[in-house]
């Protein structure tokens, strides 16, 4: 399971050091794609396969489904972790997520999310994070 929050610096070549716990779960090669909320999603090859199977079931007659699939798959790339534990974030993905100098890498169960520092701090101060609202949503979900 992928959990935790880590802050890292992006080097001049657009690389970040992937936390060792995440490298263990993701493997030497993994898929990085555009995520929701202007962050990036990273999946192990195994989890990507599971996700693909679910997404294959979306109705191609649905414009929204086709748009989502294009967004999700066109932005995807296979990344490789080098011997120093670094991974290159492609320029188009850095631009999409607003990544410049520093990033937050978080674990969300079966995926990682890579956030620009600015976007992550905004997300964490968002009014949606009130304890009462979260508690209410958890109750609605049966948690």
Curated annotation (Swiss-Prot):
Residues 5-47, 76-119 form the SpoVT-AbrB domain. GO terms for biological process: negative regulation of DNA-templated transcription initiation. One of its GO terms (molecular function) is DNA-binding transcription factor activity. Keywords: Cytoplasm, DNA-binding, Repeat, Transcription, Transcription regulation. Belongs to the MraZ family. Forms oligomers. This is Transcriptional regulator MraZ. It comes from the Bacteria. One of its GO terms (cellular component) is nucleoid. InterPro entries: MraZ, MraZ_C, MraZ_dom, MraZ_N, MraZ_sf, SpoVT-AbrB_dom, SpoVT-AbrB_sf. PROSITE patterns: SPOVT_ABRB. Coiled coil: none annotated. The keyword Repeat applies. Its main location: cytoplasm. It is found in: Cytoplasm, Nucleoid.
């Amino acid at each position: 399971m992928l959990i935790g929050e880590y802050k890292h610096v992006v080097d001049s070549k657009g690389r970040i050091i992937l936390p060792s716990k995440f490298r263990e779960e993701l493997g030497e090669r993994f898929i990085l794609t555009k995520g929701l909320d202007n962050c990036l999603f990273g999946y192990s090859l195994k989890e990507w396969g599971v996700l693909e199977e679910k997404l294959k079931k979306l109705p191609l007659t649905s414009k929204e489904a086709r748009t989502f699939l294009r967004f999700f798959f066109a932005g995807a790339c296979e990344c490789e972790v080098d011997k120093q534990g670094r991974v290159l974030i492609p320029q188009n993905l850095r631009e999409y997520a607003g990544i410049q100098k520093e990033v937050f890498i978080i674990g969300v169960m079966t995926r990682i999310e890579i956030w620009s520092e600015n976007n992550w701090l905004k997300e964490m101060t968002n009014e949606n994070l009130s304890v009462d609202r979260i508690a209410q949503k958890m109750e609605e979900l049966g948690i």
